[in-house]
């Protein structure tokens, strides 16, 4: 089957923002204008097409990023048909894992900001993630009809707080209630959308007199930015020649794709203004799959890297970036094809798990209706139905051309609660439900507490766990009681020690013999991408046979799960196996595993252990009148205030506070500031807990 849409006309984009910048409404409008959904959904009345889980509609926030395929030919049908795959990403900090996962498979992003509140803490997180994956992006300043909306202020904030070179390609005409349309700086015309047909049509007029000077100045800056794309344009510009319309577009496009500049547009999705122009800008300025850096992957165990071209005839390689459970068809695995093609009924090889699976049916999602497809090609995003062993971040590839596209790193959960089923009948269903949810979301973990026999679930924040329990009730009909949230403490060692672990059992017949000498050293904890555990083998001359060494490592790692102070897992340990002995007959893997865990247990006690607690980065936005109270309260919670800034909504206080002190903070902050302050927090790192706190926890533990 030949390609319907040439690869040059593909755009895989994400729409990202923080909570409430109006991201889902923006996506909704895009679906409306591109003709995929005939009735517009409003997030206010819970009917939006990308928010298809019940809880999302109730809470008005987006949790799972739905991938939607749309087609667009431009506001004036001036382009051949382009295929735009849109991934709507969640903006709530508890779901940053979803955002990270989506950015990974995108070629470009539209970052939505609120015209009045501007850059918020969450926007910084998203921006940082986009930088990490080098995603070219443009900005849409939304809600220009809101009180206090100011386009240029937001553009400045993006420059200062996110360190991006923002280049406006539009200006708003009027603001707040008087927001009428936009000035297109490329065409130097004013665009007014027609309210009678919800913005499907528009008219071009001359720029209002009062704005001509401002528009000229902004256009000059835009042309200068375009001229810096290459020497030819620069020379032309410096000699005072005019750059043509096409040259300006090409200059801006090249620099956007190189991640040198970020183009800024504005509008109000809710009022049907501006989104249409954003779609045109996506086609004009964001890259097609073959214009971004080719994806790299490891092709063997030595870590040899290769790239894969965006080509239908290359070997097949795709990345599974999301698993969702659908009430009608079961498991959906969303994947992005980087190279090659795949027909339904063919087998793919999962190179991370080393397993082969047959792809039965494939669908493309259009918000909430599905279209069955027979074949996917390079650049496509689709979902496969019923793959058994695939988890998020796995690579699907051609069995004869194995490749592992970069593995994703998932954050450690910081908060845990105990859950128990309300009735015996729910017990088994709960196990199945939690297993499925953990498969969908790697930042969510499930374990059974050995002492109490309780099921403990851990995640990235209170909202995250609320939603998990909620989904259990709705999708799997499991009623459960939740305990109080518990902080996920950890333990560490503070000094290096040499320890010996010896396990000998002679009881007639075959005995057991394992003997190891291990050096344990603490690793620095404040490393962003630091390792939690490093195992070094320094055995020479076979004093411990090679086949038993993995067993020693396993014994040490398993023992690290149970600390010696209060039973919390140990972090940040380097273990060096340097000596030991074995017995020809009695030694086996089990004996060495036990010897390893004995050494770890003994060593942890001798190595001056300490308790670690999770520290959160907290940002509070508050009116100036309550600033003293807020800072005082943060100090009472053992917080360290890192700095203060002016924000459009008041003072912004940045602090680091232990998670254990942050429970119920939302309620306390509301009552202290009469509901006028807001806060956001995310995990920063683990730090040693003060001795009085540690003692109390150890007594309890």
Curated annotation (Swiss-Prot):
InterPro entries, alphabetized: EFG_II, EFG_III, EFG_III/V, EFG_IV, EFG_V, EFG_V-like, EFTu-like_2, G_TR_CS
SMART domains: EFG_C (SM00838), EFG_IV (SM00889)
Binding site for GTP: 17-24, 88-92, 142-145
SUPFAM superfamilies from the UniProt entry: EF-G C-terminal domain-like, P-loop containing nucleoside triphosphate hydrolases, Ribosomal protein S5 domain 2-like, Translation proteins
GO CC entries: cytoplasm
NCBIfam families (UniProt xref): EF-G, PRK12740.1-5, small_GTP
Known function: Catalyzes the GTP-dependent ribosomal translocation step during translation elongation. During this step, the ribosome changes from the pre-translocational (PRE) to the post-translocational (POST) state as the newly formed A-site-bound peptidyl-tRNA and P-site-bound deacylated tRNA move to the P and E sites, respectively. Catalyzes the coordinated movement of the two tRNA molecules, the mRNA and conformational changes in the ribosome.
Protein name: Elongation factor G
Gene transcribed to yield this protein: fusA
């Amino acid at each position: 089957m030949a390609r319907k849409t040439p690869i040059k006309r593909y755009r895989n984009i994400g729409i990202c923002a923080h909570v409430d910048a109006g991201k889902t409404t923006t996506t909704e409008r895009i679906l409306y204008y591109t003709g995929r959904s005939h009735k517009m959904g409003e997030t206010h009345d819970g009917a939006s097409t990308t928010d298809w889980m019940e809880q999302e509609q109730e809470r008005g926030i987006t949790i799972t990023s739905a991938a939607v395929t749309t087609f667009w030919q431009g506001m004036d049908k001036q382009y051949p048909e382009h295929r735009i795959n849109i991934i709507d990403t969640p903006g709530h900090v508890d779901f940053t894992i979803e955002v990270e996962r989506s950015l990974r498979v995108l070629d470009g992003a539209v970052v939505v900001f609120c015209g009045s509140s501007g850059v918020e803490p969450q926007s910084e997180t998203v921006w940082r993630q986009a930088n990490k994956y080098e995603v070219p992006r443009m900005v849409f300043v939304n809600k220009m009809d809101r009180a206090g909306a100011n386009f240029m202020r937001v553009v400045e904030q993006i420059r200062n707080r996110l360190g991006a070179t923002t280049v406006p390609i539009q200006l708003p005409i009027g603001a707040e209630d008087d927001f009428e349309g936009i000035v297109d700086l490329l065409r130097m015309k004013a665009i007014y959308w027609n309210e009678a047909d919800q913005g499907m049509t528009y008219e071009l007029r001359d720029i209002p007199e009062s704005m001509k000077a401002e528009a000229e100045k902004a256009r000059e800056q835009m042309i200068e930015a375009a001229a810096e794309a290459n020497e030819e344009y620069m020379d032309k510009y410096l000699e005072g020649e005019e750059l043509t319309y096409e040259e300006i577009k090409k200059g801006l496009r090249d620099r956007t794709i190189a991640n040198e500049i970020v183009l800024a547009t504005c509008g109000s999705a809710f009022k049907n203004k501006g989104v249409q122009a954003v779609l045109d800008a996506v086609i004009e300025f964001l890259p097609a799959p073959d214009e971004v850096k080719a994806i790299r992957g490891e092709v063997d165990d030595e870590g040899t890297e290769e790239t894969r071209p965006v080509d239908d005839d290359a070997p097949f390689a795709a990345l599974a970036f999301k698993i969702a459970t659908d009430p009608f068809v079961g498991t959906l695995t969303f994947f992005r094809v980087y190279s090659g093609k795949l027909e339904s009924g063919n087998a793919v090889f999962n190179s991370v798990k080393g397993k082969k699976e047959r792809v039965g049916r494939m669908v493309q999602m259009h918000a909430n209706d599905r279209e069955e497809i027979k074949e996917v090609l390079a650049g496509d995003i689709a979902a496969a139905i019923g793959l058994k062993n695939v988890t998020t971040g796995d690579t699907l590839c051609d069995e004869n051309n194995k490749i592992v596209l970069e593995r994703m790193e998932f954050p450690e959960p910081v908060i845990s609660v105990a859950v128990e089923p309300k009735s015996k009948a729910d017990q088994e269903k709960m196990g199945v439900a939690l297993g499925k949810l953990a498969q969908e979301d790697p930042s969510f973990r499930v374990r059974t507490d050995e002492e109490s026999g309780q099921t403990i679930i851990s995640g990235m924040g209170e909202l995250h766990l609320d939603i998990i329990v909620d989904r259990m009730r709705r999708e799997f009909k499991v009623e459960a009681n939740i305990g109080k949230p518990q902080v996920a403490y950890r333990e560490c060692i503070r000094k290096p020690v040499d320890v010996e672990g010896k396990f000998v059992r002679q009881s007639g017949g075959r005995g057991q013999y394992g003997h190891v000498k291990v050096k344990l050293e603490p690793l620095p904890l404040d490393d962003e991408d630091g390792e939690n555990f490093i195992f070094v083998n320094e055995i020479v001359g076979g004093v411990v046979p090679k086949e038993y060494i993995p067993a020693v490592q396993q014994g040490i790692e398993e023992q690290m799960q149970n600390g010696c102070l209060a039973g919390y897992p140990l972090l940040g340990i380097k273990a060096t196996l340097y000596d030991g002995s074995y017995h020809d007959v009695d030694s086996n893997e089990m004996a060495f595993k036990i010897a390893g865990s004995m050494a770890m247990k003994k060593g942890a006690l001798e190595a001056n252990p300490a308790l670690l607690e999770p520290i959160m980065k907290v940002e509070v936005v508050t009116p100036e009148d309550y600033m003293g109270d807020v800072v005082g309260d943060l100090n009472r919670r053992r917080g360290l205030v890192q700095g203060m800034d002016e924000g459009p909504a008041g003072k912004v206080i940045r602090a680091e506070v232990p998670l254990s002190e942050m429970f119920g903070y939302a309620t306390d902050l509301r009552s202290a500031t009469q509901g006028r302050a807001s806060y956001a927090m995310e995990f920063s790192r683990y730090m040693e807990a003060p001795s009085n706190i540690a003692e109390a926890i150890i007594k309890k533990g």
